[in-house]
Amino acid sequence: MITEKQLIEIKHLQDECEKFEEINLKLNWEMLRNRKNDLKEDFFYYDKDQLVGFVATYYFGEKVEICGMVHPNFRRKGIFSNLLNEALNNLAPVSTILLNAPEVSKTAKEFIKKQENCTYSFSEYQMVWKEQELIEFTPIVNFTKAVQLDFAFISNLDVVCFGFEKNDAEKYNQRILNEPDRALYIIEVNNEKIGKLSLLRENNESWIYGFAILPEYQGKGYGKNALLQIIEKENKIGNEIHLEVALENSNAKKLYTGCGFRQYNTQDYYVIKR
């Protein structure tokens, strides 16, 4: 578990790093705030009483993502390399290790170039809905709060729509169902389950994750209708609306841009071989 003091220190360091390079770091704050197990997942480097380096690991079933940062005034001292090695040495058994870095971070690119065991894997767009006149629509899908009985359906969607391994999908969704700050919804048409999405609200932002529609129901307007309902609801409460989409998922990107989302950041992922 991370203490409240440590969370404040991490946020301050994040602000310094993002301001220096004009980047957006993906630190998965909902996971940092809800650390529960005994596994060592977060690694800190202090200069006297100041946090100047931080690396975190995030488990998604048999896959782990790693993200970190070092204060601009303390770079080129081996701090990130040491923290990354410490994180790698403390990993639970996993099948895939991914290092995450903002596409525009020159510091990250320089570091990764020097890593012989680091290979580019894929990218994700981070998108935001720009406040505008909402597209007119009539609700044709319904949302119900997911419960444990929906677990198999939800996990199967991640296998079918996102290429998850079954075990990874089950581990990931068990965590999502238990996260207090995130709501997981089933999307239905005529009482038939056709999709799902999760919604995380924090700091006047609403983040849409894991948005998926069964293939046999795609291309019928259900996904767009669901998205427009979420946009309308979150916009009414004054939240800025964000989501992420894989770079290669052109159909999803077309759907999001058609609903008013615009790309503002790209996150790159690199596989680390051990």
Map each language-model feature to its residues.
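Active-site rim helix/loop that mediates acceptor-substrate recognition in acyltransferases
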Residues: 18-48, 163-198
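C-terminal "cap" of GNAT-fold acetyltransferases
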Residues: 123-147, 239-240, 244-250, 262-274
